[in-house]
Design a protein with these regions (language model features):
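N-terminal accessory targeting/assembly segments
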Residues: 1-101
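P-loop NTP-binding catalytic core
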Residues: 75, 79, 83-151
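Conserved P-loop NTPase
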Residues: 114-122, 278-298
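Hydrophobic anchor at the beta1->P-loop junction of P-loop NTPases
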Residues: 156
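Conserved lysine of the Walker
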Residues: 164
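Hydrophobic positions on the alpha1 helix immediately C-terminal to the Walker A/P-loop
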Residues: 167, 171
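P-loop NTPase switch/communication element
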Residues: 175-219
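Conserved P-loop NTPase nucleotide-binding/switch module
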Residues: 225-287
């Protein structure tokens, strides 16, 4: 398997004092956590790492570990908004901003609520930067066992940070070399489109619906692109399930991911789960083990 990181693109957003330590870590970072007046935390899968007073990476946390100042939190926020906060207001209210390269920055603070809806987030106090990574070949085992010879309806399930998006990205690359694929990339994490061009390899015959909601993307893809299969990440709402079922009824295959801890969880949440041919349950990183279930045997 070949791993491709976009760390160089990502490092530019961080305060200068922190860039060298992040760059020195090299590949392998999965998350970078910044909190106001708290130590910067570098996550390597489940390992929690810190930066000591000499700029070195350490597993030990003490009073000398590098802390993120309030000024650096504000600087990082303006950097990821490209100094135009109002342009990202909708993303901010949704709780995340997607950067070039497909990296996603989750943010938290104090919600401003009007009419039962979040209209702004003020006093932002923390960020979780999820590092986007292409792992070419990661999806080959699933592809060879499920899609050998014909397309199937497949659900990729797992806990948060279990690698669902990375698996989907590689399956998209593989499927897009043989079939007409429509990719609904609501958060710009899979293809990482920048200036209209996917930065990640999602297959030569893949049409990317970048920034579309899953419901809108599914409806549009079915209507205008005649796909053999539609791929998208993190199905969850009843509207999305409804459009998935509609696409299946139109003879289009679906390959989607879902947050789920067990097969029983999936059965409870998706009434038409038997319409899927296979369910793939992912284990936790870094082992990335998975189990493939045939729904007609469940």
């Amino acid at each position: 398997m070949k791993t491709a990181d976009n760390m160089q693109d990502l490092i530019q957003y961080f305060p200068e004092r922190l860039r060298e330590s992040i760059a020195a870590f090299g590949n392998g970072l999965t998350e970078i956590r910044l909190r106001r007046e708290k130590p910067i935390i570098l996550m390597r899968n489940s390992d929690m790492l810190f930066v000591d007073s000499n700029g070195k990476i350490t597993k030990a946390v003490d009073s000398e570990c590098v802390k993120v100042t309030s000024a650096e939190i504000d600087s990082f926020f303006y950097a990821i908004c490209r100094n135009s906060v109002h342009s990202f207001q909708e993303d901010i209210c949704s709780g995340f901003i997607t950067l070039s390269g497909g990296h996603r920055v989750g943010l938290c603070g104090t919600a401003v609520v009007r009419g039962g809806k979040i209209t702004n987030i003020k006093n932002i106090n923390g960020f979780n930067v999820r590092v986007s990574r292409e792992i070419i070949g990661l999806g080959e085992d699933i592809y060879n066992k499920i899609f050998c010879g014909e397309l199937k309806n497949v659900l990729i399930a797992g806990a948060p940070a279990s690698g669902k998006t990375t698996i989907l990205r590689d399956l998209c690359r593989l499927l897009g070399s043989r079939y007409k694929v429509s990719l609904i990339d609501e958060r710009s994490e899979i293809a990482a489109v920048y200036s209209g061009v996917p930065q990640n390899d999602v297959g030569m015959n893949t049409d990317v619906f970048d920034g579309y909601s899953k419901a809108d993307g599914l409806e549009t893809a079915v209507r205008v692109m005649s796909p053999d299969i539609i791929i998208f990440d993190e199905a969850g709402s009843q509207d999305e399930f409804g459009y998935m079922e509609h696409a299946m009824n139109c003879g289009i295959r679906i390959c989607a991911s879902i947050h789920a801890s067990s097969i029983e969880d999936i059965k409870r949440r998706i009434p038409f789960w038997k319409s899927f041919d296979h369910i793939v349950m992912l284990g936790k990183l870094p082992k990335q083990e998975h189990r493939i279930f045939r729904t007609d045997e469940l």
